[in-house]
Curated annotation (Swiss-Prot):
Keywords of the record: Endonuclease, Hydrolase, Metal-binding, Nuclease, tRNA processing, Zinc
Biological source species: Leuconostoc mesenteroides subsp. mesenteroides (strain ATCC 8293 / DSM 20343 / BCRC 11652 / CCM 1803 / JCM 6124 / NCDO 523 / NBRC 100496 / NCIMB 8023 / NCTC 12954 / NRRL B-1118 / 37Y)
Protein name (Swiss-Prot/TrEMBL): Ribonuclease Z
Names of the cofactor(s): Zn(2+)
Active site: 67
EC number annotated for this UniProt entry: 3.1.26.11
NCBIfam families: PRK00055.1-3, RNase_Z
Cofactor binding note from Swiss-Prot or TrEMBL: Binds 2 Zn(2+) ions.
Similarity field: Belongs to the RNase Z family.
UniProt gene name: rnz
Length: 318
């Protein structure tokens, strides 16, 4: 599991940062990529990476401001040009209006896609769940309807303890598969063994939270609780003047992000959606200020890739 930042700026593109889009790379977990927001020129950014549009199976849109959605029609069209077909459908989760926006752009430009799109209007709570992941949405406080997302990976089953099976003189073969599935098996010699006795501890799944435009609110902490990574907007810095600007424009400061990361017991905080004025020394100052409140903080740049490892068992690390 990895995060790849395709755009880390706010409002409009700059020389150093494109507008918002983040890829959650789930190639090992489900051979797929999920996009969170698709700002203008996201498809151009993708061309500079190893990402393949056909691998994108889900798109999550936080809100309908242009710097978060203007790249959608172009990306969808290019995905079609690159050969996506009816066996590679795409689901777009977003506020009411995202379907109208996409369909209007495609209709007026007479663009016909070679694959189906399913649209899911966001509601509070679980918006997607299967055997590998669950995604939870909650409303934010911005100038228009806006949402945050919590991606929860399901726990991974423990490994089959082969050495323990051998010590118990349990012969290899199909029985191992049954025990791995947690079944109770009767062996040829009459012994009855329970698969759960030969399976190691489950590996706890990872949690990633996306808060891309909002002023502070209780739902941010709720979505971020115990997250391995919290990706949080930081349109403004921590000065008193910038705090006033953030409040006026319904955004957050870097201090807001650090505070919620600390209260929510987040492992790593990644700041994105930065104003264009944050370049060079100002970025270093921003990092320095935030790390005084939350040490494990990183300021994302376009094309950064961040690994999200499994948490080590506390007993293992002793």
């Amino acid at each position: 599991m990895q995060l790849e930042f395709l755009g880390t700026g706010s409002g409009q593109p700059s020389k150093f940062r494109n507008v918002t889009s983040i890829a959650l790379r789930l190639l090992d977990e489900r051979n797929a990529v999920w996009l969170f927001d698709v700002g203008e020129a996201t498809q151009h950014q993708i061309l500079k990476t190893t990402l393949r549009p056909r691998k994108v199976e889900k798109i999550f849109i936080t809100h309908l401001h242009g710097d978060h959605i203007f790249g959608l029609p172009g990306f969808l069209s290019s995905r079609s040009f690159q050969g996506a077909d009816k066996n590679e459908p795409l689901t777009i989760y977003g506020p009411k209006g995202v379907k109208e926006f996409v369909q209007t752009a495609l209709r007026i430009s007479e663009t016909r896609l070679s694959y189906p799109i399913e649209y899911v209007d966001l509601t509070e709570g679980v918006i997607f769940e299967d055997h590998t992941f669950q995604v939870v949405a909650a409303p934010m406080r911005h100038r228009i309807e806006t949402w945050g997302f919590r991606v929860i990976e399901k726990d991974h089953p423990g490994e089959l303890l082969v050495d323990k099976l051998k010590q118990g003189n349990i012969p290899s073969g199909p029985v191992y598969g049954q025990l791995k599935a947690g079944k109770t098996v009767t062996l040829p010699d009459g012994r009855i063994v329970n698969g759960h006795d030969f399976i190691g501890k489950a590996q706890k799944g990872r949690i990633v939270t996306f808060i891309l435009d909002t002023r502070p609110n209780d739902n941010v902490e709720w979505l971020a609780k115990n997250a391995d990574v919290l990706v949080h907007e930081s349109t403004y810095g921590s000065s008193e003047e910038e705090a006033k600007m953030a409040k006026a424009h319904a955004h957050s400061t870097s201090a807001n992000a650090a505070s919620v990361a600390r209260r929510a017991h987040v492992n790593k905080l990644v700041l994105t959606h930065l104003s264009a004025r944050y370049i060079g020394p100002m970025v270093k100052e921003l990092i320095h200020d935030v790390r005084r409140n939350f040490a494990n903080t990183y300021v994302a740049r376009d094309f950064d890739i961040i690994d999200i490892p499994f948490k080590k068992d506390s007993n293992e690390s002793k």
